[in-house]
Amino acid sequence: MPRVPSASATGSSALLSLLCAFSLGRAAPFQLTILHTNDVHARVEETNQDSGKCFTQSFAGVARRWTKIEELRARDKNVLLLDAGDQYQGTIWFNYYKGAEAAHFIEAVGYNAMALGNHEFDNGAEGLLDPFLLNVSFPVLSANLEQGEDQVPSLIGYYKPSTVLDVNGEKIGVVGYTSKETPTLSSPGPHLIFKDEIQAVQHEVDILVSQGIDKIIALGHSGFETDKLIAQKVRGVDVVVGGHSNTFLYTGKAPSNDVPVGPYPFLVNSDDQRTIPVVQAYAYGKYLGYLKLTFDKGEVIKREGNPILLNSSIIQDPVLLAEVNKWKESLANFGKEVIGRTVVYLNGTTEECRNRECNMGNLICDAMIQQNIRNPDEKFWNHVSICIFQGGGIRAPINEQNNGTIQVDSLLAVLPFGSTIDLLEVYGSTLRAAFDHSVRRYGQNTGEFLQVSGIQVQFNLKRPPGSRVVKIDVLCADCRVPHYQPLLDNKIYKIVTNSYIAEGGDGFTMLKNERLRYDTGSTDISVVSSYIKQMKVVYPAVEGRILFVENSATLPIINLKIGLSLFAFLTWFLHCS
C-alpha cells in the first residue's frame, strides 16, 4: 500500500509551503550606497590640507576622487554618485575655463545627478547654460528655481525639479533644491526666481510618491540648517544630501584637522515620526561622502558610513591625471594677461602689511566690498560694508614703475593661496575679539594683523594683549548715506573676509566658532582682478583706517598733529587780522 502521510506531516508541509510563498512574495531589503560631494569649487587639481595650492601635502583632486569612486563601485552593488552644488568658482581653473572644466571632469567621473548651487549663477544664466548645462548628460536639479517669461537665455529643458534613477531595477527619486538667497549671493539676474525650498521640495516629493516612488533623496544646496528643516518638515523624504555650509560631519575620531560639528549621518526626527539621515561632505573635494542605506518596504531601516578622506594614500588615477595636466597647460599663458595699471607703489611687503595699514590691504579690501555691491533697497545701500583681511595673506608688492602694468601673475604673487572671499554674519563682540587677536603679538611680524575696509580702529599697544582695542567704528550698511558708527557688541554684522581666517586660520577661531552664517564666495584673484579691470587705473592711499594711540584718553597721533596745525594757523590768522 502506498504510504499515507500523517496529519502532523501534512500540516508541516503546508506550513512550509506557506512560508516559502510568503518569502517569495516579500521583497528583500535593498541596500543603496550614496557617494556624494558638495562645494568642490573648481578644485580640479590636488590641494594642500587647507584646500589651497598644493606645495607639499596632497589632498583631493578629481583624479584621486575617481580612484576611490571606481573602487567603491566595484565593491558595492548599488551605487549612486551625487553632487550637491557649487562646482563653480574657487580657483584659477574657473577664472580661465568659466565652468567648462567642471562640466568636463564631472562628466568624466560619471555623476548620476547634481543640484544647482548658488555659485553656478556667478556668470549669469548664460554662464551656466554654456559651458556647463549644454555639456553634461546627467540630470541637473532644482525644484525651487522658476524662470520668468523674460529670461534670456532660457534654461527650460536644461534643468529639472527632480529625476527618477534606476538602480538595478529599483526606482530612486531625487529632488533638487537651491538656496533661495541666491539672488543676494550670486548673479542670476532678475528673471530667475528662487522660491521657498521646503514648499517646493514637498510639492515635488508628492508628485513622486503619487507615481509609486518610495525611496526619495533630497539633494540640495541651502546649508545644513535648511537640510535639517527639510528632513523634519518634508513628508516622504528618506535622506537629505546637502551642501552650501561646508559642514563636516563624522562619527568617531576625525582623520584630518577638520573638526566635525556632529555625527555622520546626522539624524533628524521628522514630523511624520521617522528618523531621517542628513549628510554633507565638508568641501573642496577633500572628502568623498559615503552613506550606506538599507531600505525595507520603502523605509530606511539602517544607515551607516563616514566621509572618506582623499589624501596621498589614495593614488591619483593616471589616465584622468594626464587629462588634468593637459587642461592645465592652457593656464600657463593666463598669468600674462594685463588687467590694469597702478600709478602708485602697491606696498604689499611683510613689514608694512603685518604692522600697520598698507595700501595693498586697502586695495584688496575695497575690491572685496565692491564685489559684494548688489541689490540695494530702500534700507540698505549694500548688504555688507565691512572687510577684514589678515596681513599674512598679502605676500608681495607691485611696483608702479615699468608703466605700472598689473598682470594676473603679479596678483598671483600677492595672493598665492587660492582663498575665496566669503561672507559671514557675526556679532559685534566677535568682530571686536578678532581685532584684539590681530594685535596680541604685535611687533613679531606674525600674519594676523588685520587690514580693513569700512572700519576705523584704534589700538593702544601699551595695554596687555586681549585688551588693546580702544575704539572701533564701522561703516553703516542700513543707511542711505554711509557714515561711521560705533561698533555694538550685541548687533549682528555682515563682513567679508577670506576663507583662510573664516575657517579659523592664524588663530581667528572666533570667526569659525561664533559665526552665525557663512557663505563661500569667489576667488581672491578673481575679485581683485575684476576690481582693477573696472577701475583701469588704481592709486590706493593710506587713509587712517588703522591708528595707534597712547591711551584711551589720547587723541590719535595723526589727528593731534592736524589739530595743532589748525590751532597754529588760526592763531596766526587772528593775529594778522
Curated annotation (Swiss-Prot):
Its main location: membrane. Its cofactor is Zn(2+). Its EC number is 3.1.3.5. Glycans are attached at N135, N311, N347, N403. Zn(2+) 1 binds at D39, H41, D86. Keywords: Cell membrane, Disulfide bond, Glycoprotein, GPI-anchor, Hydrolase, Lipoprotein, Membrane, Metal-binding, Nucleotide-binding, Signal, Zinc. SUPFAM superfamilies: 5'-nucleotidase (syn. UDP-sugar hydrolase), C-terminal domain (SSF55816), Metallo-dependent phosphatases (SSF56300). Coiled coil: none annotated. A lipid is attached at S552 (GPI-anchor amidated serine). GO terms for cellular component: plasma membrane; side of membrane. Belongs to the 5'-nucleotidase family. Homodimer. Hydrolyzes extracellular nucleotides into membrane permeable nucleosides. This is 5'-nucleotidase. The lineage of its organism: Eukaryota, Metazoa, Chordata, Craniata, Vertebrata.
